[in-house]
Every structure is written in C-alpha cells, then in structure tokens.
Amino acid sequence: ASEIASLHNLSYYINKGERYGIPVLGVVAVGKEMERTTRYFALATRLLAEQGAHIIKTYYCENFEQITAACPVPIVIAGGKKVPEPEALDMAYRAVNEGAAGVDMGRNVLQAECPSAMLQAIRMVVHENVKPEAAYKAYQTLMKDVK
C-alpha cells in the first residue's frame, strides 16, 4: 500500500482502538530500498506516535537513543534477521539501555538452538539489566538443563 493509504489505515484503526480501549502498535516498515538511518527512524516513530499509536515497533540502529528521546510513546525493537545468540543479546541490551521499552524478537528466539533458553536469556537482559555476556552464559547453562 502507498504511504497515504497506510496513514489512512493507521488512523482508522487507532480510532477504532480508542473506541474499544485497545492499544495500537505502530510498526516502522522498511522495504529493501528504503533508508535505515537515524533520521528516518526518528521521523517515522514520531509520525506514528503523533497519529496516536500507543507503542512503536522499529529497528535498532546507530544513535538509537536519539530515536527514543524524540518519541513520546514506548518503543520496542524488532529482532530483525537471525544473528548469533550473543549478538541478539547484545542488541537487546544496547536497545534497552538506550531507551527501548523492550524487544519483539521472532527468529532470534525461535531459530535459536534452544528457544526456551534464549527467551529466558532475553528476559534477563530486558527485565533484569543483565549484561549480554552473563545472559549468554546463562543461556548455555539453560540449554544443558533442557537437553
């Protein structure tokens, strides 16, 4: 859909959500040829918030703290492409420490060697501020317990 159609749809569903007390998640989409700059993400998250989204899902990028500082609603990061477990934990840690409210990871949890252990390690990083290295060690220990 075009950007204009997307904004109309967003506005429609935000109004419906408000009517029924349902929070709306705004998602910053990037196509293959769209830029992934701090400026783009800051503008897109701000636009979604000003349209009335209650929480925003976007990608982690350089200068992420500028994006979270400029956005008046909570931001969660998308997990993006599958990366090694230590990298996913590090990205989650940096994002939360730069202002993200949390993470929304799919393939970095579901495609991990042990998804349940990875989910617990991500929780440790996001909710307990455990450093990525310690969370990865916990992941390795939890993997042994599952097997």
Where is each model-derived feature located?
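Alpha/beta enzyme core
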Residues: A1-I77, K82-M105, M124, P132-K137
